[in-house]
């Protein structure tokens, strides 16, 4: 969340910056609440000062032998204490309203982020690789997978429902190989530590990374089937929408040493999303699933290092695509298309031949101190006593299912076989083709 000081001392400037991303800050409501806070705060401080001043008189009265006077002062202090407690409750209520208001406010976009309303206003930065030309009729990944007997959507519908998949044989192995290749690259060459994390998280974790309270409808939540287990209240947990949630929360409520930064972590997990706002979109194939795998990259940095870290992290995701020899383009998201907690975001979009377009395969974001403030994730500089908030970054390195889509379609051959990228062949027992 934003620093509340910005809403107190730079309200108009903050409102103008948020307006760039299409968010209208309710300035009047904030001003009204802030005026109430200041007024009640003054009353609280005055009552505390008066009580402290009068308290000193008790000893003076007792020393002078004036017990009645001392008792009278004690009564006054009791009344002041009751008034003070009531005012503190009022102050807490106003502060709670301000905090609740702040939680609905997105991050401020970086000055370098282009203005715009939606994905149509994103700005292309670069392209890598040339889309192939084919002298035969192209098939999409669904036809290729079903023809090879490796993608079974019908069984997934029977078992669970739409937007799920059953993979078989070499297709399942390819899916595993892609993830393992990514993990090996990021841990062996890019300096990340591999993490294994829970796939179920509590509400504090989802709050920390910004999914709650605003995006609860996009998640899958568990519903306890019994009231108690071994006399313990059942926990209400949620399936992770991305490994960003558990991995980033590893630094929640911690103070790192400056020497330990940056912290670079990666994890391969399934991800679960309700896709509540995606009805009718990408209903065919693996592009938009309720359950999909992803290799996530997370960096925890000092504030002055985070923008350079964003370039580095994005480059690590790009390296995956380059080694797989998949054409892609890099775009910087405009203010209107960025995620709620992002300060700046790059998307990598891979070429999908059957659709004759580039599709998002990775989103890499600098969250600045937005998540860190929610999580109270801090670090202490050498020689300093007061800790500071870290900056957090995350990105897909990459989405496994969409990477598989790109490999199947870009590497298809006239006879229906799929050429396995060279870097994946060692994970496929040396096989060069599927089919």
UniProtKB/Swiss-Prot annotation:
Binding site for ATP: 273-275, 360-363
UniProt EC number: 6.1.1.11
Disulfide bonds: none
Keywords on record: Aminoacyl-tRNA synthetase, ATP-binding, Cytoplasm, Ligase, Nucleotide-binding, Protein biosynthesis
InterPro entries: aa-tRNA-synt_IIb, aa-tRNA-synth_II, aa-tRNA-synth_II/BPL/LPL, Ser-tRNA-ligase_type_1, Ser-tRNA-synth_1_N, SerRS_1_N_sf, SerRS_core, tRNA-bd_arm
Pathway named in the protein's UniProt entry: Aminoacyl-tRNA biosynthesis; selenocysteinyl-tRNA(Sec) biosynthesis; L-seryl-tRNA(Sec) from L-serine and tRNA(Sec): step 1/1
Pfam entry (one): tRNA-synt_2b
Annotated positions binding L-serine: 242-244, 296, 396
Localization, UniProt: Cytoplasm
Signal peptide annotation: none
Catalytic activity annotation: tRNA(Ser) + L-serine + ATP = L-seryl-tRNA(Ser) + AMP + diphosphate + H(+); tRNA(Sec) + L-serine + ATP = L-seryl-tRNA(Sec) + AMP + diphosphate + H(+)
PROSITE patterns, per the entry: AA_TRNA_LIGASE_II (PS50862)
EC main group: ligase
GO molecular function, one term: ATP binding
Source domain of life: Bacteria
CDD domains, per the entry: SerRS_core
Example of a GO cellular component annotation carried by this entry: cytoplasm
Any one Gene Ontology BP term: selenocysteine biosynthetic process
HAMAP family xref list: Ser_tRNA_synth_type1
Family in the record: Belongs to the class-II aminoacyl-tRNA synthetase family. Type-1 seryl-tRNA synthetase subfamily.
Cited function: Catalyzes the attachment of serine to tRNA(Ser). Is also able to aminoacylate tRNA(Sec) with serine, to form the misacylated tRNA L-seryl-tRNA(Sec), which will be further converted into selenocysteinyl-tRNA(Sec).
Domain notes: Consists of two distinct domains, a catalytic core and a N-terminal extension that is involved in tRNA binding.
Quaternary structure note: Homodimer. The tRNA molecule binds across the dimer.
Descriptive protein name: Serine--tRNA ligase
Source organism (scientific name): Vibrio campbellii (strain ATCC BAA-1116)
């Amino acid at each position: 969340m934003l620093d509340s000081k910005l809403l107190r001392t730079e309200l108009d400037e903050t409102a103008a910056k948020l307006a760039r991303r299409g968010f209208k800050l309710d300035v009047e409501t904030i001003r009204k609440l802030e005026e109430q806070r200041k007024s009640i705060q003054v009353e609280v401080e005055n009552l505390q000062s008066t009580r402290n001043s009068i308290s000193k008189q008790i000893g003076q009265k007792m020393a002078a032998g004036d017990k009645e006077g001392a008792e009278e002062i004690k009564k006054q202090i009791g009344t002041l204490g009751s008034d003070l407690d009531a005012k503190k409750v009022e102050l807490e209520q106003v502060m709670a309203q301000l905090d609740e208001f702040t939680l609905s406010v997105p991050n401020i976009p970086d000055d370098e982020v282009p203005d715009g309303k939606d994905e149509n206003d994103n700005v292309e930065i670069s392209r890598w690789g040339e889309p192939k030309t084919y002298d035969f009729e192209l098939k999409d990944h669904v036809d290729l997978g079903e023809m090879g007997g490796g993608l079974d959507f019908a069984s997934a519908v029977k078992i669970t429902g739409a937007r799920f998949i059953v993979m078989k044989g070499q297709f399942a192995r390819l899916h595993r190989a892609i993830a393992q290749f990514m993990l090996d690259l990021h841990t062996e060459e890019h300096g990340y530590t591999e993490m294994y994390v829970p796939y179920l998280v509590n509400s504090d974790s989802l709050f920390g990374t910004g999914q709650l309270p605003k995006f609860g409808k996009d998640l899958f939540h568990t519903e306890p089937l019994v009231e108690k287990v071994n006399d313990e209240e059942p926990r209400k947990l949620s399936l992770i929408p991305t490994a960003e949630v558990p991995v980033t929360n590893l630094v929640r409520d911690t103070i790192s040493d400056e020497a330990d930064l940056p912290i670079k972590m990666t994890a391969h997990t399934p991800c679960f999303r309700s896709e509540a706002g995606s009805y009718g979109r990408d209903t065919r194939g693996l592009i938009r699933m309720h359950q999909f795998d992803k290799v996530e990259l997370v960096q925890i940095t000092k504030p002055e290092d985070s923008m350079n870290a964003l370039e580095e992290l994005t480059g690590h995701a790009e390296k995956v695509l380059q080694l797989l020899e998949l054409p892609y383009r890099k775009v910087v998201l405009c203010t209107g298309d960025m995620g709620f907690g992002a300060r700046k975001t790059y998307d990598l979009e891979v070429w999908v031949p059957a659709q004759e377009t580039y599709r998002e395969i990775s989103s890499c974001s600098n969250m600045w101190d937005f998540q860190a403030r929610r999580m109270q994730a801090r670090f202490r500089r050498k020689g300093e006593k007061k800790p500071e908030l870290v900056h957090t970054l995350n990105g897909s390195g990459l989405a496994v299912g969409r990477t598989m889509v790109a490999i199947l379609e870009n590497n298809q051959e006239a006879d229906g076989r799929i050429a396995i990228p060279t870097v994946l062949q060692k994970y496929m027992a040396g096989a060069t083709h599927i089919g």
